[in-house]
Amino acid sequence: EDTLTARDLLSVSIISADTHALIKSFFEAYSCISNNIYVHEGVGDINVKTIRAMVEAFAKKHQKTPVVIIDYIQILAPYQSKTVTDKQNMDKSVLELKRLARDLNAVIIGVSSLNRMSYNDAITMSAFKESGAIEYSADVLIGLQLAGVGGDKFNVEQAKQENPRKIEVKVLKNRNGPVLPSYLMYYYPADNLFVDVLEKPNALPLAQLFDPLQQQELPF
């Protein structure tokens, strides 16, 4: 499919008619869903209290609870006094997000960074940075890692130079269901695009990973 990267747009002094038409088609496609997307830039001291106030105001106004995506949780402002440690603040923030999800029956997706010691090893639940509360509080934990990481011949720099990169999706925790097999995807960095790769015999389409209607068809 035709794609344009941010670099493409910034490096073109005069946009051709074909490129202009392509950009227009992108905006038209986005306009179909844009009314359902609200973006709050992380400018200023946004913490879990701020997020809770936003979600409660939205739910009251629209009579429905939004899906909340936090990118990413390690840069949230401290929940409590700055005299406590980063880990204590992060644990408190994660626990309050869990409470928000429970109180409003909301879906909250939090993006997390990993500790640097995990870059060359297979991802585990302990890899999530600065917080054991992530491991214990989350209903579902999904990790992304370069395929082959942790192997004797794995070279992280070489793997990052590949285009596309092979990315393995690992379900580390699924509180209310089975932990499914790893899933392989291609990642195109220039386009920030993930593409399904059905190379493994037991791989599932990503949309089926947590579809309860597909549970009886899982390959185990």
Name each model-derived stretch:
Residues D2-L10, I14-A17, K24-C32, K49-V68, ...:
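C-terminal regions of RecA-like/P-loop NTPase motor modules
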Residues N35-I37, A106:
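Short, conserved active-site loop motifs that form the nucleotide-linked donor/cofactor pocket
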Residues Y38-V39, L141:
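Conserved beta-strand scaffold positions in the cores of enzyme catalytic domains, especially
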Residues E41-T50:
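Functional beta-strand-loop-alpha-helix junction segments that form "active/interaction loops"
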Residues I51, N89-E96:
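Hydrophobic alpha-helical membrane-association signature
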Residues G110-S113:
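Conserved H-loop
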